[in-house]
C-alpha cells in the first residue's frame, strides 16, 4: 500500500479557463511537472480527480477530455513526472446529453472517485491527501476523511478571501501552488 495524492485538474494542474472546449486551451501551470515528479520520487500514487460536467452539458465530447488527459501526460513526461490514474466525472443532473445527465456518486464533493481509486490502486488512506483550488475539493477531501490542501492558483485566492469565511470545512493547509503543496505533504511524511 502506498499513500496517494488526489489532485484536481482545472486550476490546480492547468490554467483555469472555464470549460476547456479545445485542446489548444490546455496550459500547464508553472511547477506542476516538478511537483508531480517530487511526489513520484517519494513513493506517492498520483491520482487526478476532476469534475468534467461540460460533457453532460454538451459543451464538449468525452473524447476531448481523454485527448486533453493524453496531452497532459505527454507534457508531464518532459519533467519525468507521471500520473498513476485519472478519474473524472462527466455527469451533471441538469445536463443536456442524456447519457451523462444524472445524479451520481462520482461528482465532487461526493467521494466516489476516491473510493474507486482506493479499491483499484491499493491506497493507504491514512497517509493520503487531496489538493485543489476550490472549496469543493476540500469538501471532497472531508467526505473521504482525508486532509485537503487548497492551492492559491485557479479559483484559490477568491475561495480564501470570499468563500472560506462562510464555510465550516477548512483546508488542512493553504499552499501557493501545487509544488508548495507537494513540499508540505513530504514534510508531513517525516
Label the predicted regions.
Residues 14-30, 55-64, 78-81, 96-105:
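Metal-dependent phosphoesterase signature
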Amino acid at each position: 500500500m502506498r499513500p496517494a495524492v488526489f489532485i484536481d485538474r482545472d486550476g490546480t494542474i492547468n490554467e483555469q479557463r472555464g470549460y476547456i472546449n479545445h485542446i489548444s486551451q490546455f496550459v500547464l501551470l508553472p511547477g506542476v511537472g516538478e511537483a508531480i515528479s517530487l511526489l513520484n520520487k517519494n513513493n506517492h500514487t498520483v491520482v487526478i480527480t476532476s469534475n468534467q460536467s461540460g460533457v453532460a452539458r454538451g459543451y464538449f465530447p468525452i473524447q476531448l477530455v481523454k485527448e486533453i488527459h493524453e496531452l497532459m501526460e505527454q507534457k508531464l513526461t518532459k519533467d519525468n513526472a507521471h500520473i498513476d490514474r485519472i478519474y473524472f466525472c462527466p455527469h451533471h443532473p441538469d445536463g443536456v446529453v442524456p447519457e451523462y445527465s444524472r445524479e451520481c456518486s462520482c461528482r465532487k464533493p461526493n467521494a466516489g472517485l476516491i473510493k474507486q481509486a482506493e479499491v483499484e490502486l491499493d491506497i493507504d488512506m491514512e497517509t493520503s491527501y487531496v489538493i485543489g483550488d476550490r472549496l469543493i475539493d476540500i469538501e471532497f477531501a472531508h467526505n473521504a476523511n482525508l486532509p485537503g490542501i487548497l492551492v492559491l492558483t485557479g479559483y484559490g485566492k477568491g475561495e480564501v478571501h470570499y468563500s472560506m469565511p462562510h464555510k465550516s470545512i477548512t483546508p488542512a493547509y493553504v499552499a501557493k501552488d501545487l509544488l508548495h503543496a507537494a513540499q508540505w505533504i513530504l514534510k508531513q511524511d517525516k
